[in-house]
Amino acid sequence: MRKPPEPVEVIKQRRDAALTGLIGRVPYIRYLGVTFDRRGDELTGVLPFAEKLIGNPILPAIHGGVTSAFLEITSVITLSWTNLWDDLESGALEDATTFPRMPKTIDFTVDYLRSGLPRDAYARARITRAGRRYASVHVEAWQDNQSKLFAQATGHFLMPQPRVDTK
């Protein structure tokens, strides 16, 4: 006989705890104020506007380094979330404090398409190749209108290898 499905509240709590734990591992994410909107297995990064993010006060425009960091954060968290998803859904990842290591950036190329205005920004990453050792990601950022990107990037990442117990 099959086990009855878990209540949806339990599943949502487990997913939210895992995402919070994943984000909490990177202090710079907290400093920038980046959060993630989760819809099923899809994540959207949210960079709430703050005065400290302005790089050019004359325009004003979001600093290019902040834009780049936001895109890279969205890429790394999306890769990590995708790697966790199967364990999370099967219940194998019960403790929200034990996560695999994060992917390491090999290279990251940003295209600045227009100035980031002094308002909230959003980003979504798409994994274009995911292997055991290497992954490629394309990420896009927008503000008011998703069809008007202000930046996009392509990144290549070294995927973490499973830890081997030597007992």
Residue ranges and their predicted role:
Residues 1-167:
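Terminal targeting signals and extreme-terminal segments of soluble enzymes
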